[in-house]
């Protein structure tokens, strides 16, 4: 494992950039569909204390401010599903908000929930490739190598991975082809669990 960390994994930067662009396009299309269907979500109730002609406020007349839909906001997703899809949450967080995760969105199974699920999935994948703290493109060296840490020094003697966690690479072939054998070498795999 020490040699693996020192040698690093060969990382196909060009394919990673192409995949990032593809994911960003998919995200834009999905966000566009959701925003065209549900443009805004309900914001806070506001009661002006005085008239404001430029803003159109009238003293004492309450109104609800609208916010543009953020398809990756769990609060916005819950509001859309409850308001437009008549969804009744079964699980709540400690603060009383509905739990909105991948499992819940799959269980709902509506077209809208699956679009929100796609947005969350793409966001997670973009975090792995380019946006996260331990994003692969950020940790790739000038030699196109990623030197991650893999250890069996856990209580259960299972592998622990970090900086980045390459054990969590999605099984999608588009992601697996980013990690290749060094040119002129052969990649041999083993299951360490």
Protein language model features and the residues they cover:
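Conserved "right-hand" nucleotidyltransferase catalytic core of DNA-directed polymerases
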Residues: 1-175, 180-186, 192-193
